[in-house]
């Protein structure tokens, strides 16, 4: 399963860990993904999606209608 948010489209980014001695080590910064079951009222069913914490915050404000459009 890919590490991409369904709603925001966030995906892993690459960069460097920099130590106190200024040594650079390549690393992969993962999005803060969570698997959630969400009730879609229009379709009267549960949907299992992987969302970032920011996407869950957006959904709590706007509702599940936006997610339902993306899943169709």
UniProtKB/Swiss-Prot annotation:
Pfam families: Ribosomal_L28. GO terms for molecular function: structural constituent of ribosome. GO terms for cellular component: ribonucleoprotein complex; ribosome. The keyword Ribosomal protein applies. It comes from Chlorobaculum tepidum (strain ATCC 49652 / DSM 12025 / NBRC 103806 / TLS). One of its GO terms (biological process) is translation. Belongs to the bacterial ribosomal protein bL28 family. InterPro entries: Ribosomal_bL28, Ribosomal_bL28/bL31-like_sf, Ribosomal_bL28_bact-type, Ribosomal_bL28_sf. Coiled coil: none annotated. It comes from the Bacteria. The lineage of its organism: Bacteria, Pseudomonadati, Chlorobiota, Chlorobiia, Chlorobiales. NCBIfam families: L28 (TIGR00009). The gene is rpmB. The keyword Ribosomal protein applies. This is Large ribosomal subunit protein bL28. Keywords: Ribonucleoprotein, Ribosomal protein.
